[in-house]
């Protein structure tokens, strides 16, 4: 894909290590303030933790139990902001919280929801209220023993697409984004840093210079800090594995459920990709290498048991059509319980004689990524005199500049412009790309004009767009991170997609 013009001297203001939500968010913020930015990700964007979340933009209702009022307030403010800036990939969800006798008392739930409603200074989503589950349609999927509960609001997000959109906007503002490129080593030299990069495809090495380094390596933050950068730090990361399962749709309706468990944890059941239900997450301490991880049989059984405590329809491991796991790099606050570890973030700056800073990101949650990025650049501001002010709070993400942030109006307009699209395909394109969907459809007057047809409504035109503009190189990049069409793609279609990508690379060579 086309990259921003490369500085022939190999010099940058900021080298960002890591292409997850924090790395791309920081790169975007920095580039928009006028810094020369290089972001390196050794795999694909959002390949690990950032595509393995519960896919919620939320204040974190359960964090109130741990008195994290500042975190919840900040997250609620960001929820409102992001809903406005990316209405295609973020949308409101109504949650059902059943009162489960013997667990948290009803008064505690009421107090928590009252705080949740009122910690948000600005609120566009409906507030909480009590609901009688035996007479309300939202109670129909639940067991008869659950007679009352509460409704409240939060938001859904396409997590991996949020990462990609931040990278796209960073590049549009001058950043250079390199995927499949690892930072092998970086050391202070002269007035800045000198780093050795290795291209994962060609194996070629390259040396670049940067004034400052941001270590946003996620689960590898400590390894990168001590190994790649050669810096000792008192800040530590605590790795927590979280797993989710996807099953055929458990219930009718667009509401999600938040289910209390006897071990004090909560589990979400969320409508997913029209025909499925997403269930998660687990919280398991993790001490192995934080690479690709998979759900364990014990985690699968646990999540099924959690559903079977509350839903009338029972599920078992045989019902799972897909699962995913990720390792969350939380700041180690010495909490005894994995679920109690803070989701707040710590930004650790190591410098030498007041220069050559390296900022490392510990912890954080996807909801507050924009604020984290803003905070990170503010911490680096003393090293860049004349840096432009913060700007991301009012800037839509790519595809999100819809009048009034009105997704439904945009979808209706897209259907008028491309009446040949099946309704579901039009909705999927509008959700995934927002106003950029028009780039994929440019010049098309029929489905045939969009090129080769793959399963799930994917077309050659969409694939080519993803290769040109979104750093997609492999079928997995497209089927599991740029979309979730892997749930609808058979082996024959996947093989044709791989062949299409191979032909495209050969033609571009």
Positions of predicted regions on the chain:
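A conserved short coil-to-beta-strand element within the FAD-binding core of flavoproteins
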Residues: 179-193
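C-terminal catalytic lobe of FAD-dependent flavoproteins
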Residues: 153, 159-161, 169, 228-279, ...
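Core beta-strand elements of the Rossmann-like FAD/NAD(P) dinucleotide-binding domain
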Residues: 10-12, 202-212
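Flavin (primarily FAD) binding-site architecture
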Residues: 215-230
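Glycine-rich Rossmann-fold phosphate-binding loop(s) that bind the pyrophosphate
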Residues: 18-20, 42
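Glycine-rich FAD pyrophosphate-binding loop
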Residues: 31-51
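Extreme N-terminal leader/targeting segments of oxidoreductases
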Residues: 1-14, 29-33
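Dinucleotide-binding Rossmann-like beta1-alpha1 core, especially the glycine-rich loop
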Residues: 55-138
